[in-house]
Amino acid sequence: MNSSLQVGIGIDVGSSSARIGVYNYYNDALLEMAQEPVPYYQDSSKKSWKFWQKSTEIIKALQKCLQKLNIREYEVKSCGVSATCSLAIFERDRTSNMLIPYPNEDNVIFWMDSSAVNECQWLNMQCPQQLLDYLGGKFVPEMGVPKLKYFLDEYSHLRDKHFHIFDLHQYIAYELSRLYEWNIEGLLGRENLNGIGNDGEVSGWSSSFYKNIINLPSNVSIGTTSLVANKHISTTVVRSCIDSYASWFAVASPHLETSLFMIAGTSSCYMYGTTISDTRIPGVWGPFDTILDNRGDFSVYAAGQSCTGKLIEHLFESHPCARKILKDGADIYQVLEQTIRDIEKNNGLSIHILTKDMFFYGDYEGNRTPFADPRIKGSFIGESTDTSMLNLTYKYICILEFLSFQTKLIIDTFQNENSNIHIKELRISGSQAKNERLLSLISLVNNGVAIIKPKENVDMMGIKGAYVLAKSAKEKKQLADVITERDISNDSEKFESLAEYRLGNDSILLRKLLCVKYHIHLDMAKQQKRYHKLVDEVFQHL
């Protein structure tokens, strides 16, 4: 290694792994990449949060990656960190001033945790509607602020302790800066221009929000507030963000206002950028005003669903035929695709015609957007005692239909009559971008919308976007300028749908069927809300 080689680092901490990429600072070429597993834990019987991680395991995994990459042998110009929208909790030792995981090593409330239902109800009653409209109309349990409120109600009475609560990405960036003696100036807590925390995370809110609504105790600090900056003078610039935004930064279209980005993995998130706007879109988060620049010239809107790719994982984990395929070591997606082709050939009908009487709704972890309703759950009409390969295939198709309908609902929500948004292309990254049948369905149910994919490995977009984030800060450039001025035509490609899903090739009957099933999809959500209301009425006068 040559210590004079100047590099930038991109870090992406996802739901189950940590990845680090080292990029040539001057030509943006990926030089090396390292990856380590990072587990999350689940126990639905716990009284407190049900999903968690350990910050110690995350940092150790990242240190292993950095050691593999011999990072100290480079001249590091910048480091970008992206991580899930989880919450990290620490107690500050009064003697050493060190941060200690609290209440024990299980100190990261995982993004997937939705325990803070009561706290959401309290916040939605306390906050003015004008504020809530920036969050799609309501706080939802997976956001950072409800998780913070949950923690405060449990622990803030312990006045002999001083707590630090971080958005996970900010903590990781702070801790790595401390360990590697990088500059943390860019991580110091600042209010967003409109005083709203991006995606409901704990940083970025106005001081009046924490004082007047949350009533934040004096023994609780948010992020790096009151932490002493390292004394080392370093020119290595460090920045951090939620992982979904990093993936967007990597592949965002220069034509922001006609392009919607979708990062689709375990969950799915959507991002849309436009020139500054104060328009609130019902069911959509935003506008947020400091993500693409700090001048207030651009607004960002976001939406998301908690359980998307996880639906397929759950099917594979729970269905006996899927378990056998996985046990045998076969590629389950290839097996399913071949089975679909065989079924269609033998029946002379589209697989969707054969599943016409099966209706799946998959908000297993509640609905983030556009309904902001944690009580909505999964449902399936068409269940039987069948556990054959045919049944597995049909259920897989039903999940793909649900995911395509869900994406259509998000696009329709963005394009409501008052938003003045017109989506011409959908850019997709993440593990679901590898599923050609799913992408074909999404395009078809959205009237043939163009789907753009990265040419590079879709799993690498998080580290690339994190690198872009920090490099732009190092060069004192606005992200919006970097995105709108660059040419990424060689980095992305238009996806060609499978023949049976292309407009003009698909049968009129199939298109009519999917249209009807989309309206059934909407009705299934509506009926759940109706059932909840009927049940609630039983308890109103007790």
UniProtKB/Swiss-Prot annotation:
One of its GO terms (cellular component) is cytoplasm. One of its GO terms (molecular function) is D-ribulokinase activity. One of its GO terms (biological process) is pentose metabolic process. Signal peptide: none annotated. It holds the Pfam family FGGY_N. Present with 1050 molecules/cell in log phase SD medium. This is Protein MPA43. The gene is MPA43.
